[in-house]
Swiss-Prot record:
Protein task: Specifically methylates guanosine-37 in various tRNAs.
Residues that coordinate or bind S-adenosyl-L-methionine: 113, 133-138
EC number, UniProt record: 2.1.1.228
GO biological process, one term: tRNA N1-guanine methylation
Protein name: tRNA (guanine-N(1)-)-methyltransferase
GO (cellular component) term, any one: cytosol
Annotated PANTHER family: TRNA (GUANINE-N(1)-)-METHYLTRANSFERASE
SUPFAM superfamilies: alpha/beta knot (SSF75217)
Localization in the cell: Cytoplasm
Organism listed in the record: Stenotrophomonas maltophilia (strain R551-3)
Length: 252
């Protein structure tokens, strides 16, 4: 996997991709990261990459020429086809399903805008898709690029010490449920004890408890993710049992 990032702050991406799981994956050679600053491809003494918008209004707009030259340099550096992704609040929301799709690509170019945005002509001519982190606005696309790099890199084969870790994450699995609660030592603590079933050694019971907790959490915290009509009999039974137990606990 190769990431090429067009950004005015390439050092930011290099630093964020050097930490934790992602940093270790990079050291293993599971992906490469290349930052490209459009200012390096701007002409004139001031290396200008922005100008005022036609029609007036606040802010500045990133210019076509430096971006086009930067993108051409990226394509010249490696013949591998690359999907060009613009990080924008106008894009489709980033989901785990999209992350899995991106993780299967050999290469992508992440375009990070700044100021009021990028000249629309450049976007229409070069961008394959736009992705958003959510319905809010950031100072630039770098944080979005860092999120995509992190999410995609950890899915590369060998990135995680235990491959099952990714399979058990929230939004993974057959229904895309939220993850279940996790506990570690000590078993007993003033803040509460670890559920007895997790200490029982009964793997079937533990699996059923974890599945039930995932169902309950998804129903309570992200009901938009749970299609109860699509649940199988076993899942429906687990969810009904949990709801019944909650009602009994709440009753005087």
């Amino acid at each position: 996997m190769r990431f090429d990032v067009i950004t005015l702050f390439p050092e930011f991406l290099a630093q964020s991709a050097g930490l934790g799981v992602v940093g270790r994956a990079r050291e293993k050679g599971l992906f490469s990261l290349h930052g490209w600053n459009p200012r390096d491809y701007a002409e004139g003494n001031y290396r200008r990459v922005d100008d005022r918008p036609f029609g007036g209004g606040p802010g500045m707009v990133m210019l076509i020429e430096p971006l086009q030259a930067c993108l051409q340099a990226i394509r010249d550096a490696d013949p591998t086809p690359a999907r060009v992704i613009h990080l924008s609040p106008q894009g489709a929301p980033l989901t785990q399903a999209k992350v899995r799709e991106l993780a299967a690509l050999p290469r992508m170019v992440l375009l990070c805008g700044r100021y009021e945005g990028i000249d629309e002509r450049f976007l229409e001519a070069n961008v394959d898709e736009e992705i958003s982190l959510g319905d809010y606005v950031l100072s630039g696309g770098e944080l979005g690029a860092a999120v995509i790099i992190d999410a995609v890199a950890r899915l590369q084969d060998g990135a995680l010490n235990d491959a099952e870790s990714a399979a058990q994450d929230s939004f993974e699995g057959d229904l895309g449920l939220l993850d279940c609660p996790h506990y570690s030592q000590p078993a007993q603590h003033p803040l509460g004890d670890v559920p007895e079933v997790l200490r029982s050694g009964n793997h079937a019971a533990i699996a059923a408890w974890r599945r039930q907790q995932s169902l309950v959490r998804t129903a309570q915290r992200r009901p938009d993710l749970l299609d109860e009509q699509a649940l199988g009999k076993a899942d429906r039974k687990l969810l009904d049992q949990a709801r019944q137990a909650q009602k009994q606990k709440a009753s005087p």
